[in-house]
Amino acid sequence: MYKGILTTVGGPQNVWKEITNFDGRKVTMKLDPEPSQKLINHSPDGFQWGYGGSGPSQLALALLLDVTGDSGLSVALHQDFKNNFVATWGESWQMEADEILRWVQLRRCNEGEKSEEVEL
């Protein structure tokens, strides 16, 4: 589970990732923007949400990268993911990794249908 709560007006916001540890206990950790910034550095300051800017782009890329582990796929889909989700979030939000994976799978299916239509 990923979640965020606005803590300041403007500026970077923390995003939290809740995972189940090897012993079954839930652990909450901060999502690090650095891996996504190494792919595309939209926002050197970090994450934001609720509008269509650079901070939300960084968050969309980071979420996709963290969930899928696929840098190419994450780069290709992050702007659409931002527009569909991140830009619409209010003061607080939460999203399960499974929801993100379902969205990715749906996008990949839709893209496959489009390319099949072009080939015919």
Language-model-detected regions and their locations in the chain:
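Amphipathic alpha-helical packing elements
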Residues: 13-82
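Long, low-hydrophobicity ectodomains and other hydrophilic envelope-associated domains
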Residues: 1-16
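Short intrinsically disordered terminal tails
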Residues: 1, 111-120
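Short, compact, well-ordered microdomains
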Residues: 67-111
